[in-house]
Amino acid sequence: MTTEVDEVNDGAAPATGTTAASLLVHGVPRSRRQAVTAFLATWASQIGITLAFVAVWLTFIILAPDTFLDSRIYVSFAQTTPYFAIVALTLTMVIVSGDIDLSFPSIMGLSMVGFIGVERGLNGSVELAVLAALAVGAAAGLFNGVFVTVVGIPALVVTIGTQFLFRGLTLVLVNGRSYALVEARDTVAYRLLVGRFLGIPMQFVWCVLIAAGTWLLLYRHRLGQNAHVVGDNRHAAELMGIPIRRTRIILFVLTGMAAALAGVMNSLQVANFYPSIGAGYLLPALAAVFVGGTSVFGGRGTVWGTFLGAFLIGGIDAGIIAVGLTDYYTELIYGAIILVAISIHAVLQRRFER
């Protein structure tokens, strides 16, 4: 039996039909029909999130023009939304591979423990502290990946556990204390991570760069091709000799590093580290991924959708308050968005597969 993998297009999983089973379905060869199905499903989700983004933004502009026609609010979005958008982008790859990581908010805090330890122990070397934070994030992601792939426990269960484990470890290591980082504002690391470039917040610049890198990894690199096949059909991936365990572990490591970077940026921006950092980013990041068109079932995802989804979710909080509602509605709307997005993708997937 031979298996062929088509080139992965933006958001479309590779076709994994076997030549022996390339039967005609409604007059179309099976492999070609799968490719057409993936193409339609992908572009439907990307066009959908783009139209939703424009519609919601126009609604906010009409209902609250004083707020949403002021350039300052967009500078604010460019500073704050990347904190969860960066993680959502790498989380997209994890979900495409058929896994999920719910521990990233706690990894943000744990990585900052490494930052504080190096920064306080090496005469204020913020640049080395950033590298230490990234190393801790990578180690936390490696722990998740190994636990999931070697022990064989579902990622959902493992990362719920490590979310509490990493948060508890953070609290124990810093004894529940916060740390001021005011002196870090005069460093190169501060200017590179949360400064300004031509008036644009560096958080947004990094978010765009990471989005571009994620796109290249997911659609133009073997890692992304493997992730698509693993998420779409793990048995087929085994038959094709794809390194399933290594692929999944690498994606968890990348998400851990993204969480660490987001934690460092957040702490530098507010010039303070607090152990509960990242606690409010779980729902926004998940909502960005799913509303952006990534399938909860794995095998299909879109970086463009996640990027737009993150800024759509980031604008909802401000929009709710600007139109006169209280912030009590925020989590209600986040939860509703996740459920609706997952339901729509499930219905579309069943419809396209018929």
Task: Walk through the language-model features, giving the residues of each.
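Single transmembrane alpha-helix segments in multi-pass membrane proteins
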Residues: 55-122, 146-153, 286-303, 336
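Transmembrane alpha-helical segments in multi-pass inner-membrane proteins
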Residues: 259, 269-335
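Hydrophobic core segments of alpha-helical transmembrane domains in multi-pass membrane transport
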Residues: 49-61, 91, 163, 167-168, ...
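Cytosolic-side transmembrane-helix boundaries in multi-pass membrane proteins
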Residues: 2-54, 58, 232, 239-246, ...
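Hydrophobic alpha-helical transmembrane segments
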Residues: 46-51, 77, 84-85, 106-110, ...
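Transmembrane helix-bundle core of multi-pass membrane transporters
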Residues: 155-221, 247-250, 269-278, 353-354
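Short loop segments and helix-boundary regions at transmembrane helix junctions
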Residues: 35-41, 95-100, 121, 138-181, ...
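Helix-loop-helix "hairpin" substructures at the membrane interface of multi-pass membrane proteins
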Residues: 124-133, 138-144, 148, 196-273
